[in-house]
Amino acid sequence: MTSDLSSKHCESCEGIGAALNSEQIKNLLPQLNTKWEVTEDNRIIKRAFSFKNFYETMAFVNAIAWIANIENHHPDLEVGYNYCHVHFMTHALNGLTHNDFICAAKIDKLLVD
């Protein structure tokens, strides 16, 4: 599940280099909650979260917004009454970077499964 990734901070996307390759992604994924998935094209990590009501959902979304602001790395969110789907990719590189895994690990720490 979560590892020391959650204690790291994101790098600026300017000059970050190349997107992670399949092997790097394969090594980082086990450091996240097992509910995170990688898309077949290795460009996105995603996870679905469920809640009891709209209030809990929005509290979670606001916590994600706070993390995203602090790290200056922002996910794509799909939000409904009792769910939030989180998708991370580094848009500047059209793929995954350590930043995506760092933010996912920080989100994992928000909830106890």
From Swiss-Prot:
GO terms for biological process: tetrahydrobiopterin biosynthetic process. It comes from the Bacteria. InterPro entries: PCD_sf, Pterin_deHydtase. The keyword Amino-acid biosynthesis does not apply. The keyword Flavoprotein does not apply. Keywords: Lyase. It catalyses: (4aS,6R)-4a-hydroxy-L-erythro-5,6,7,8-tetrahydrobiopterin = (6R)-L-erythro-6,7-dihydrobiopterin + H2O. CDD domains: PCD_DCoH_subfamily_a. Its EC number is 4.2.1.96. NCBIfam families: PRK00823.1-4 (NF002019). This is Putative pterin-4-alpha-carbinolamine dehydratase.
